[in-house]
Amino acid sequence: MLLYLSRQSIPIALPLLIDTDHVKLSYFFACFSFFYGVSKFVNGIIMDSKNNPLFMFGLCNIATGLLTIGITSSYNNLTLLLLTLILLAWTQGLGWPAITKFMVTNSSISSIASSWGVMSASQQLGSCITLIVLPSIIKIYDAKSAFLYSGLLCLLFGIYTILKAYYKESANFTTYYKVQKSQIGIKVTSSIWFLCCATFCAYIIKMGIFFWFPIILKNKLQISLVQSSLITGVYDLGGILGTLITGRISDMYFFQNRSLLASLYMLGIALTFIAMNFGQNIILMNLGAILSGFFIFGVQVLTGVIAVEIAPQNNVCAIVSLTGLFGYIASSIFSCVLLGVLVKHCGNSIMFSFFSICSVVALVCFSILSSKDLKKLSKAV
């Protein structure tokens, strides 16, 4: 939750600190997303051979806290700011592989989607709190306070987590984990490639909303930053519901074919953005925000669990992180740079049309995976 608090402060507070246009700002967002994705993949490979996810997660929070606070003193120099954001992205990339290792080694296959949903919901809670609280903090104090407070919370929580991990290790807690030695060679099947492609498209939407929703809604509806951030907060509220409900539904009814549920969700996302494209009032945008949040974060849970199920046992973290790598490469190129250019030249409404197209492509990929699951079930019968 606190890692997401730090990350969400970037698109809210950074535009207020540096005087630049959408396209130049998108380059900073792109670098952050790209290095976050690469770090996630590299650390995923490393975590397959490690047995201390709590310690690594605490270390991630400490480094994130220090670097987030560091933004307050580096924003005047764009080169130094870019370097700080790259380092921040790299340290945050350690967080999810550590969480994945913890969940895989402490959850059964019949309940992993529910656990994944709870963990994802905590991320959305952090984002929701950020979108509601940070604009008020910025209004009362200044933009630097957003980075200062979120960084300080991450730092304190990281210290607490490392101390907790140390005492658990001294009690032989780590012997609970069943660890297999990671192999350097990672076998990537056609199913994994289709999942990566689906994640690629889903993350264009997810990170496009993350980076651009507050700014574009402000311009499209002619409302204040506080109001547009609150609508984005409603999106994250829908995400919390989506992760929790999807995890439970997936474990109960779709455990043999989770890709089918993901296909239905992508169809829902496409229809939601088509409707939002024609919406010009706050009520419709709030409804669209909560529905899109429900569907897109539900898909995020499903992609992670599907990756766990189709990955070799000794490369689970690496394969889950590989899908994340594709997602954040997509976001760095399409959600940040391309979408920024499209909005500049075609207007704010192009975002919703762009997201609808991405939803359809992801729908096709999940449908192919679903058909493969159905063939496996028919052979088993």
Question: Which residues make up each language-model segment?
Answer:
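Extracytoplasmic gate region of multi-pass secondary transporters
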Residues: 10-12, 190-244, 300, 335-336
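Helix-to-loop junctions at the C-terminal end of transmembrane segments
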Residues: 39-52, 244-255, 343
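Structural signature of the two symmetry-related core transmembrane helices
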Residues: 55-70, 259-274
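Cytoplasmic helix-loop-helix junction between adjacent transmembrane helices
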Residues: 85-123
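Intracellular juxtamembrane helix-capping segments at the cytosolic ends
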Residues: 94-107, 298-312
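Symmetry-related core transmembrane helices of the 12-TM Major Facilitator Superfamily/SLC fold
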Residues: 145-163, 351-368
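Flexible cytoplasmic inter-helical loops of multi-pass small-molecule transporters
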Residues: 163-184, 377-380
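A late C-terminal transmembrane helix in Major Facilitator Superfamily
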Residues: 313-345
